Every structure is written in C-alpha cells, then in structure tokens.
Amino acid sequence: MKKVEAIIRKSKFDDVKKALHAIEVNFFSYWDVTGVGNEKQGHVYRGISYSTSDIQRRILSIVISDEFLEPTINAILEAASTGNVGDGKIFVSDVQDAYRIRT
C-alpha cells in the first residue's frame, strides 16, 4: 500500500476530486493549510492592498493499493496543473499496515 499526500491549489480541488473519482479513487481525506514560501499573494483588506508570503493550499491524503499509484499520480498531475509556479507537490510513502476501527 502507498500513501499519497498532495498539496494543491484550493481552486483546483474540484477538478482533482473529479479526476480521482473517474479512476475510482473514491475515498480520501483533505484539509486546508497555510504555508510560507517564495510565492507572494496579493490581498485586499478594507480597501488596502498588501502582499504576503502566506500561501493557502489544500492537502489531500490518499491510501491506495500499489496498482492504483500511477493512475492516481497522473490524475492529480493533470487536474491540478496550471503551468504556473506554486501548483503544488505530491509525496508518496509506503504504508506498512492499516487497521480498521469499528465499534
């Protein structure tokens, strides 16, 4: 088994979700994060423009069997890419064991 963690633009989340469902990856977790990087984002607050290095992104966490790894990576790459700096990163790690918790 593999764990895929993808950090993507929040605006690309729906596209990535559709791409994952299309390849039958139907369950994953996600959460919103704020990071700091080289990329600057412009904001307007009460009519005043300012720039910050705080970057809003969404992290997806997916645990899949080995045969789903390549299609999952390709689906995320195609759906999340804008061709610009800051599109995100994908990390893959091995999962030794998984246990189901039931009541």
Regions found by a protein language model. Give the residues of each.
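Positively charged, small/polar-rich N-terminal and surface patches that mediate targeting and assembly
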Residues: 1-103
